[in-house]
């Protein structure tokens, strides 16, 4: 059974009663860094306290640029310091186009991880990043690989699961996934950013009820909590998907 993670970006986007609707989640992951800077640390601390009081393990995450080894090392030191001061048990290194376009992305990722480990050796470290630059040596410095698997078509998401989970450089025990919450696509309201229920028998019609059972991620991370484009699927279902806590219940039932 995977561990289920709820990623939080900003406290202000959360419903005042948000902790009443996180049943089934094992972990709440809170944004605490942006590059080499702390990110709304006081607000993050309040979210962390609320999540801890609700009995959840708490991780941190940050958007990281890691455009050079020196800068990545500084980012790693800052992130580790925040994990230490906020008592976080895991950290998600979120690295996207800036990192992927750098001259030596794999070396920069390693520099971040090594710097982070020096100060926070006991904190679980997730490579929550673009897929293309990932290799075996780089992933060896992280505890988990957590690619972003997004899409507004059920076939797109299924295809990305298949591709990301067939990366030869990643051991099965490190495989995780970050997925959308199933909120409605505002550009096409017949689509959603994620699908819980399979729509047919073919692989291309697989929702999370089938994909999680088939690919067995160690952690399944939902991005993100709170209001997005006027919708909060933590609190209110939509025409395609139920609220997140109910999604988790269905996934768990599908695995039993």
Language-model segment annotations:
Residues 1-11, 57-68, 109-136, 146-147, ...:
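Aromatic-lined carbohydrate-recognition surfaces of secreted/lumenal glycan-active proteins
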Residues 38, 42-46, 150-189:
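Glycoside hydrolase catalytic-domain groove-lining segments
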Residues 29-30, 34-63, 101-125:
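Aromatic-lined substrate-binding rim segments of carbohydrate-active enzymes
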Residues 1-34, 64, 126-130, 223-227:
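Boundary/entry segment of secreted carbohydrate-active catalytic domains
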Residues 16-25, 39-57, 78-87, 135-141, ...:
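Acidic (Asp/Glu)-rich catalytic clusters
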Residues 29-34, 78-106, 218-224:
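Active-site groove signature of glycoside hydrolases
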Residues 153-154, 177-256:
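Substrate-binding cleft of secreted/luminal carbohydrate-active enzymes
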Residues 6-23, 69-84, 129-138, 157-158, ...:
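Short, acidic/polar
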